């Protein structure tokens, strides 16, 4: 599922 990929992307994006 892409949900897991989105979660990882969100986590990386939240690393501002």
From Swiss-Prot:
Keywords for this protein: Ribonucleoprotein, Ribosomal protein
- What is the role of this chain? Involved in the binding of tRNA to the ribosomes.
A GO CC term assigned to this protein in UniProt:
ribosome
Q: Gene encoding this polypeptide?
A: rpsJ
**Subunit arrangement?**
Part of the 30S ribosomal subunit.
Q: Which residues form a coiled coil?
A: none
> What is the name of this protein?
Small ribosomal subunit protein uS10
Positions of transmembrane segments: none
- Asked if Ribonucleoprotein is a keyword of the record, the answer is yes
Family, according to the entry, reads as follows:
Belongs to the universal ribosomal protein uS10 family.
């Amino acid at each position: 599922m892409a949900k897991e990929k989105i979660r990882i992307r969100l986590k990386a994006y939240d690393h501002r």
